Amino acid sequence: MMHLQRNLRKRRVLATAIFVVLGVAATRTCGAQTQKPASSFGPSNPFYAPSTRPFQAPAFDKIKDSDYEPAIDAGMAQQLIEVEAIANNPAPPTFENTFVALERSGQLYDRAWNAFNCVTQANTDPELEKVQDYEAPRTAAHQDAIDLNTKLFARIKTIYDERASLSLDAESLRLVEYQYQQFVKAGANLSDSDKEKLKKLDEEESTLENTFMTKLLDATTAGAYSTTDPSTLAGLSAGQKAAAAEEANAHKQQGWLLPLQNTTQQPDLAFLSDRAARHEIFEHSWNRAERGDANDTRTTLARLAQLRAEKAALLGYPNYAAWNLTDQMAKTPEAAIRFLDALVPAATAKAASEAKEIQALGDYPNGGAAPDPADWEFYAEQVRKAKFDYDQAQVKPYFELNNVLEKGVFYAANELYGLTFKERKDLPVWQPDVRVFEVFEADGTPLALWYCDYFKRDNKNGGAWEDSLVGQSKLLGTLPVVYNVANFEKPAPGEPALLSFDDVTTMFHEFGHALHAMFANTVYPSLSGTAVPRDFVEFPSQFNEHWASYPAVFAHFARHYKTGESMPAELAAKIVKAKTFNQGYDFTEILAASELDMQWHTLPASAPLQDPYTFEQEALKRTHLSVSYVPPRYRSSYFLHIWQEGYQAGYYAYTWSEMLDDDAFQWFEDHGGMTRANGDRFRRMVLSRGNTEDLEKMYDAWLGGEPSIEPLLKNRGLTEAEWGK
């Protein structure tokens, strides 16, 4: 997953209602917000000047929780001064004194915010959460005050209207058109009174998004399954039990503790033979944020959906999705929904055939009835064993984390792009589990820094993602500092970190995002790296997943952690053959979440406040995805992607991007597979380009034609010819 909350704002000029400049503070009211004394900011703050560490990497060993708030406030205040100077420049507007000046603004803010965003997502604590609560409405006001600045927009519009006569190079012309469209989308053409209404909506939205995230993090932590009865853990491996015991010990509890993942289904359900335990864990997951307690998210999300509809109406759109998709590849919610709707019949039909396979098992207990979702993973694993003669416990010893990283992820990057990696233990990190690598070009030229933070923690958001601490820009003279975060099960002390093949795929996926950021080769930060539409940003990451099962790569990293022996060819073949196993279920749960997202965000402003349970049931029926044994991958109440992480009206992007990546991989296979020439061409024509040209044209030029949906259906085993395999 690509974290978009910051990237939607990345290099957009912002303003704030809090002013703190070089230790001299002043405040003004921002709506009805509670005022807070400003903290001092000066040379002792680690964000005061650009970091002197390699690549300007943050000095995490020097940064204290108390440093973030004054640095963020000072950064916003400084950027406001810079932007006001641009807006009030007495000289006629030019590309240099307006667009380039805007691209240079906000560097202090970026330094502080990027590091703050990293730690609050991956290593938060109560003090950071307070800062987050305090800053959330201010960052919304910060953006609005500039997006809605009449003088600034007048200069932007003047240059936009004259762009054809300015002899701009292609990237500069793209910047003019992109920024103009973004300002219009943000409401620059609204009346003054409507701008004030929009500011209040944006402020409330930012506050509620932060509230949702905090509630969900606490709800997910509280939902962990605790037991002192070892019989309830029957089916788990010794390593899994040891990790659960370590988890309990870390929480000062007796017995074992199984933390919740962010998805509806939980990995341990595939192994637990105790049906009562499975059902209890599933219930913990399903109802984690709907218990009527302080962590219940339903009221928060219902208001978020409502105010987003109100915001869209104010901006002249029938619903939020119609507004939000204007700059995406899909363009309209109707196009996105048609795309999803076309996939539903094949996915649900395949899921139904998979349900029949489960019902045919000799030890299936449900009396011939459809499988209960709490039992699906366990019995699907039995089908996997019977059908492919292997289970996940057999393969994990061949997927030791460090081996997968160095001989899989890094190996593929070397074969395709010539990259090499050197661990930098001298650089500070935000948590002891984090590792840092310097990345080099084939000729030894430094390219980037890359951090990886792979193990689950209570104070870390669920899921996996990529983001940047420093973005690439020729204008600013910066190279990328990028990080990947995941939530793999941390082994007991002295034990190896053994992964499932899904975990392996996640590593390749997130590193695909990292490559997109590291290969950025653009002038302007607003167009650099992963600053692309949602339905394109997942394409490079999902494309990189394919190399996890590519024979030459797989054989290189799939080695037993004790003996170093390669995975037996027969077992490896079974894994590859089983790639389409359970894809009916997997794809149906993804489509259900995608359609649910679109249903929430196509509500008109006139719709009343929704009851999430009723809305969800009706939405799934309406989209033909009310399948009793396949719940959505995310229930509305814990769908963090759409309520806080920038994927609102955009979760379809994963599937849209999958169409692009499957077609792209087919191109590689048709042109010689994993070769340096193919990798360099892909890097040059796609990965390095960021948002410097129309993404559809960029993709079509590289591919040599428009994408087709057929490779997606084939790779998921959803064509009729694939069903019996």
Kindly label every feature range from the protein language model.
Residues E489-F508:
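Short pre-active-site segment immediately N-terminal to the catalytic Zn-binding motif
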